[in-house]
UniProtKB/Swiss-Prot annotation:
The gene is proX. The keyword Cytoplasm applies. It comes from Acetoanaerobium sticklandii (strain ATCC 12662 / DSM 519 / JCM 1433 / CCUG 9281 / NCIMB 10654 / HF). Belongs to the PRORSD1 family. It holds the Pfam family tRNA_edit. One of its GO terms (cellular component) is cytoplasm. The keyword Disulfide bond does not apply. InterPro entries: ProX/PRXD1, YbaK/aa-tRNA-synt-asso_dom_sf, YbaK/aa-tRNA-synth-assoc-dom. This is Prolyl-tRNA editing protein ProX.
Amino acid sequence: MDMDAKQAVIAKLDELKINYTLIEHDPVYTIEEMEKIDIENVDYIVKNLFLRDAKGRQHYLVVADKDQKIDLKTLQDKIGSTKLSFASEDRLQKYLKLTKGAVSPFGVLNDETAEVEVVFDKNLVGRSCVAVHPNDNSATVVLSYEDLEKIVKANGNTFKAIEL
């Protein structure tokens, strides 16, 4: 069954009995564009960085509050990685089957071998609302941090919540 990216995410949310709100909107590619959309939960938007280590052997999906500053050098020390850099679009497609502008924690659902480690901003822990793309930048899903974590666990990816 060939579902589009958004429908696959919605199906997984329903399968795991997760409460969420789906908001449809024009495609957005940046946090700035996202903030211009008239949605109630604009304060709960997260940004997502897809990173790789120096040798390209380990990949990380960093999920942080949209206003959180992230220093890659500090982050690499905190997660015990070699030099971090942004992964290429080819790697993004290979591991998460996503394109630039649609990066999302739900990308782990496409990581069939659960190779990508998810690093959550500790400031997200306990939030009742987190707003993320459902692997499609023309919609936003609002759900709790706990439920977002449940998705990552269900896929088998390792994850941690650290202070960024």
